[in-house]
Amino acid sequence: MLVLAVLALAGLLAATASASARPVTAADRALLARPATAEEHVAERVAERLTGHEQIAVRCGNTGVPDPHVLGATPMQNGHAFDYFLMRPAECTYLTWFHDAPKRWDPRTCVASDCGYVFEIAWALQTVAHESYHLVGYTNEAQVDCYGMQSIWFVASRLGASVAEAQALAALFAQRIYPLRRTETPAYWSPECRDGGAYDLRPAGHAWPS
């Protein structure tokens, strides 16, 4: 099931997390004006821990980016973010599924009917991490995507996964999804995204990507 899912995913890699260099819009203000949903609170708590920022807002809705395949967006102006990011509603749903039953989505043990969603779960975890690094101030998509991949384990563990499962999800992304970036979405790929590379967040260790 996992191999088939990977092959199907190869044609969908235009679905990427993205930073949008634009100011706050009226649509953003409308989303931010309403209370966060339970799903959005889940993403907010993880993003706050990952960035060290307080009162980050995450909203699920229109990302404000024309490409319908974009999973998330962090509005920025003059290189500065606004301490909020947007995700597609589907990503919030996947995060909630994972938070409610982490073991169900373990790529090593999932049943066939659930394994078909494990890649979507991994994308949702990576989207939170990816956009969080934009909030910190990083704008290079290849660098941000690499950092996000290396933080999948953190997001997964904060949502209740065991260390082993969190690392397995990160490895799944690194081994099965990230290599396809090179040809499908090259702006999000870098040869320095590797153990010991320039974008290695933990060069002293070798448990790549975790």
Where are these regions (language model features)?
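A metal-dependent hydrolase signature that marks the N-terminal structural subdomain at the beginning
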Residues: 2, 11-114, 208-210
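Regulatory and partner-binding modules of innate immune sensors/adaptors
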Residues: 7-9
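Metalloprotease/metallohydrolase-associated module, dominated by Zn2+-dependent proteases
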Residues: 21, 29, 47, 54, ...
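Intrinsically disordered, low-complexity acidic Ser/Thr-rich regulatory segments
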Residues: 111-122, 126
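Active-site recognition of the HExxH zinc-binding catalytic motif
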Residues: 122, 126-141, 145-149
